[in-house]
């Protein structure tokens, strides 16, 4: 058991030597000694210990004082077994409240020492194993997040046809998110724009996000015409997502196909937030869409699109509900009212400035509160 590092803290040299002998008899040879709490904290700062056997009554700094200091940084604190007389039960209870794993009477009974120290070391081993698995999982999820973010476009200067400017951002609530956006140059001189939101969270939603993005890109190439109908594109994607959808995973989407030269295009909304029109007037939601189900919810559904015209200087703001439903610590929503108030002063700004203002406004509102939904914004403006 030489790999187990122990620290014995007691102001009595007799107790220290007796406990060290008891530990050696049980195979624990890597034992460091400390006379009081101050020395103990210095030893703990200098190296890693698997367990600390800590006396309660000591000069300089007693056992309770040591535990209070260790509690300030519990992630690096070793397990502690308190050494105490049975008459000090109230202090023992206080030590347990401060994080001590167990206590040991000063008789240092060998069977009891073996049982309690063994139990504490086993719990530490299991915790260390769980921590390592969590670390590996977090590293894998971070790699998945990086891979996922690499799927969506970022170089909008090469995507946007002449006369159009595009910007977008996506912030997963977890390492892997279910939102997506797409900005795709079409062979006929137009552009495809899409924001979508997968039901569910985490890795399953991330996999569906990648599948949906692939289906939309493939459908955009399959649908005939220089400006493929967004309804036909979403119908193709729906056929893929609705088939054998045992997990009941759905994807809301808003998809626009726009001719850069004329500003004429079409839009199809499948259970998603309608885009905002940005111009000199107050921001307003595009209207006139038929209510249509999310992708994956209704196999064979005949999606319909509506005509859309974007005049010079006008812009479109597409977003996921992670923006309007962002929550602060009081669980209040950011809401459409705040969104519209935020958009009003930047309605004529560049798409990049609108995206930046949106993310800044949401971040200010939530003020560090953890979010449960992804946040995605895409803005296009006709020059």
Where are these regions (language model features)?
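Two-component/phosphorelay signaling modules centered on CheY-like receiver
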Residues: 13-32
């Amino acid at each position: 058991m030489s790999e187990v590092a122990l620290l014995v803290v007691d102001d009595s040299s007799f107790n220290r030597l007796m406990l060290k002998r008891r530990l050696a008899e049980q195979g624990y040879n890597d034992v460091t000694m400390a006379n009081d709490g101050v020395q103990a904290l210095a030893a703990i700062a200098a190296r890693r210990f698997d367990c600390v056997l800590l006396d309660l009554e000591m000069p300089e700094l007693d056992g309770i004082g040591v535990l209070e200091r260790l509690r300030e940084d519990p992630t690096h604190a070793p397990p502690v077994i308190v050494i105490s007389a049975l008459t000090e039960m109230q202090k023992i209870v206080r030590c347990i409240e401060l994080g001590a794993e167990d206590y040991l009477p000063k008789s240092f009974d060998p069977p009891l020492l073996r049982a309690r120290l063994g139990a504490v070391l086993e719990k530490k081993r299991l915790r260390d194993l769980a921590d390592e698995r969590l670390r590996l999982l977090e590293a894998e999820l971070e790699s998945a997040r990086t891979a996922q973010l690499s799927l969506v476009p970022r170089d909008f200067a090469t995507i946007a046809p002449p006369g159009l400017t595009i910007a977008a951002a996506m912030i997963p609530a977890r390492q892997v998110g279910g939102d997506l956006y797409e900005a795709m140059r079409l062979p006929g001189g137009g552009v495809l724009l899409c924001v979508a939101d997968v039901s569910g969270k985490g890795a399953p939603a991330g996999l569906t996000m990648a599948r949906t993005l692939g289906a939309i890109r493939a459908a955009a190439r399959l649908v005939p015409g220089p400006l493929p109908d967004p309804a036909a594109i979403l119908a193709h994607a729906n056929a893929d997502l609705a088939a054998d959808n045992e997990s009941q995973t759905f994807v809301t989407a808003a998809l626009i196909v726009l001719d850069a030269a004329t500003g004429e295009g079409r839009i199809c909304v499948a259970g998603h937030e309608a885009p905002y029109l940005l111009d000199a007037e107050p921001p307003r939601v595009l209207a006139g869409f038929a209510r249509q189900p999310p992708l994956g919810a209704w196999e064979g559904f005949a999606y319909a699109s509506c005509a859309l015209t974007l005049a010079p200087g006008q812009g479109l703001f597409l977003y996921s509900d992670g923006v309007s439903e962002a929550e602060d610590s009081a669980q209040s929503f950011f809401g459409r009212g705040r969104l519209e108030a935020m958009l009003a002063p930047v309605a004529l700004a560049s798409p990049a400035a609108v995206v930046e203002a949106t993310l800044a406004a949401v971040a200010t509102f939530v003020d560090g509160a953890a979010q449960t939904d992804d946040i995605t914004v895409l803005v296009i403006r006709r020059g």
